[in-house]
Amino acid sequence: MTTIPEMIHARFAIDTARGTGITASETIECVLSRRAVRRYKDEEVQEGLVDVLLACAQSAPTKSNLQQYSIIIVRDPIVKSKLQELCPKTDWLASSPVFLVFCADMRRNQRISEFRGYEHANNNLDTFLNATVDAAL
């Protein structure tokens, strides 16, 4: 069994006594062993799986639970190549089967307010910053 100090060492390459004697829960183990893999199988991601993963992402808490972002699903190889050109050090992007772009979306809550018959009074820098943070989460 891997200990928390061993997991911290593997993650950050530092020796520490933090977590000594504490049993790692599945959540702690999952978070500390997380890593990014940017090698992809040469196959499409099932549409239903993308929908489920997006539902999970949109279930994460955000500022006031407003979900002030929109998600653009990119599958087109030409569009992915153009995005790769705009983003340095993303050689992996064009080879990804699907690429998700999270965008701060102030217009989303404006439209919800209009739909429900309310005035959208928070059209200001604070709303922009909240939307940006929501997209980044």
Locations of regions flagged by a protein language model:
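Acidic, surface-exposed loops and disordered segments
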Residues: M1-L137
